[in-house]
Amino acid sequence: MAKLNWICLLCILTLLLSGCWSKRELNELAIVVALGIDKIDDEYEITVQIVDPSEISMRQASTQRSPVVSYHSRGETIFEAIRKMTTIAARKPYFAHLQVVVLGEDLAKEGISDALDLIVRDHEFRKDFDVIMSHEATAKEVLNVLTPIEKVPANKMLNSLDVSEKAWGSTIAVNIDELVNTLSNKHKGALISAIEVHGDKKLGVDQTNVQRVKTPVLLRYTGLAVFKGDKYIGLLTESESKSVSFLNDKIQSTIEIIACPNKGTLSTEITQSTTKVKGSFKNGKPKIDVHINVEQNVGEVECDIDLTKNKSIDYVNKKTAQGIDERIEKTVEKIQQQYEVDVFGFGDALHRADPKQWKKIKDDWTSIFPDLAVVVHVKVTTQGSGTMQNSLLNKPKEE
């Protein structure tokens, strides 16, 4: 009996210990936090941004070494280029902590489906990293820029993307799963945020870029990249990108500016925005109604408007709604006529509204979308005016 117990114990221990057979020590890995993919002629050029743990540790005094290092490699396929990187890196690149993938603009113009295959297929890549596109720069040039405040440039790109999406609305964070799902929908176009290098790209790689009060080279998000199928076809301006975010119910907060009745301007802070898209068919003809409800506070007043009066608040509400409405309508028209791709999910709304009617038109959606009737309704409510009601320019009348 005792012998049987020992055998059972050994079997249990064998099962427990087998879990460590594939372990890899931290000092044996090169932790990749950002991956750049460019297309040079018929080859892929891969850039990996690898963290130096000793340089970002709070316990260790700062040295003159960079907190990250970039390695570059070329290959006929991305898989080959990554493996060839072991000839220059002291450790094998490890992608389980990847935070962001930067797609080069030239690659995006050719098509991104092939480039995404490995990172979607390989088990080592987690599926929660964001995907962005470089604009007027290669992915390599973007990942070579050292950034102030955030020691790791990948963190800077990720944090700026998140903060801008929440406070301004001209960017959207799109992870790899969301992008692949959109690319798989032949009736919908994809959108990803575009980033560019401001300043001399050659200076961005130097440590002095983070040692000056006025940083000479910066990474800046510049709008949304529009894809038709898997190909990049154009860039939306900051204003157009915000309009798309309103339509896609992505606005969490932003700023609106209106002209005052006499002269000067007034700024408001959007605190909440809710968008509902309704599709319908009339005599077989599709139509989209967009209802946007906005709540805001007065943020800055540079005119003599009297905010204690209801008619002034009504004026602010009306002008804000009018401004949002006009920008959205112009953006929709541009996307319909210039890009001819449904980045709003209007096709999905029509499918939900009437599956039978949608089935009749879905194969012709590409030709129907440019002439689709889209009606936008914007309602704005102003809830507060901050810690003071009127501007210092609004002087009370003498009695």
Language-model segment annotations:
Residues 2-8, 14-399:
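Membrane-proximal alpha-helical signals and transmembrane carboxylates
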